[in-house]
Amino acid sequence: MAVVTMKQLLDSGAHFGHQTRRWNPKMKRFIFTDRNGIYIIDLQQTLTYIDSAYEFVKETVAHGGSIMFVGTKKQAQESIAQEATRVGMPYVNQRWLGGMLTNFQTVHKRLQRMKELEAMEQTGGFEGRTKKEILMLTREKNKLERSLGGIRDMAKVPSAIWVVDTNKEHLAVAEARKLNIPIIAILDTNCDPDVVDYPIPGNDDAIRSAALLTKVIASAVAEGLQARAGAGADKAEAGQDGAAAEPLAEWEQELLAGATTAAPEAAAGEAAAAPEQSS
């Protein structure tokens, strides 16, 4: 069965690029035609690139890797959080903080501080303090949760990142490239394909297009988790050490059942509205 269908892509508006005056010439090979001043993306190529990205993500996760989901623009925030949470992967859907990848040791300290403040609040650690102190601590906790909540369980830099809009997320892209972390991303007609390892030509401005493609990547993660669990079970039965792939953590086991039930076909049911166009 196809990972995603041409009809799903069309219904989500994935074929609509930017206005012809707002484009990156490097994207020419991914463009089918232009209509009314809007570039139309070649969805046949999109399908091919989706298969390649899907396989890479699935294999990466199956061998113990993790995928960070990144999308801070309004059109992507909800789907990034929803799909990453569905498969237990880290995500950033608010502001990207410089150093999230290249200075992860410092970021990890901020994560520990966030968890410390949460524990204080839950165990009565705020009691006996002045109202001003409690207010300051609460504000600090809320700020940390807003900016770092999506990566709270990330113990190390991810194996790869999924990006919606490489132009907006240029800081994340630059950090990933500096660390040689593979980048999977939607490539709209104004993007630079040279900075992406696994491109998916498509509309990164339409809510439904971003949601559909993010769901595809999350489903690849889910399949990878399932393969990892199966490999671990096989090795346990054979009495082997299982060093090739990391076993599933408890939270991954809990997520697995629900994660594998949702598939990209769900996007077809959301196709009642007309395709959204890029501005």
From Swiss-Prot:
Belongs to the universal ribosomal protein uS2 family. GO terms for molecular function: structural constituent of ribosome. PANTHER family: 30S RIBOSOMAL PROTEIN S2 PROKARYOTIC AND ORGANELLAR, SMALL RIBOSOMAL SUBUNIT PROTEIN US2M. HAMAP family: Ribosomal_uS2_B (MF_00291_B). Gene3D superfamilies: Glucose-6-phosphate isomerase like protein, domain 1 (3.40.50.10490), Helix hairpin bin (1.10.287.610). It comes from Mycolicibacterium gilvum (strain PYR-GCK). Keywords: Ribonucleoprotein, Ribosomal protein. GO terms for cellular component: cytosolic small ribosomal subunit. The keyword S-adenosyl-L-methionine does not apply. Residues 255-279 are annotated as: Disordered. It comes from the Bacteria. This is Small ribosomal subunit protein uS2.
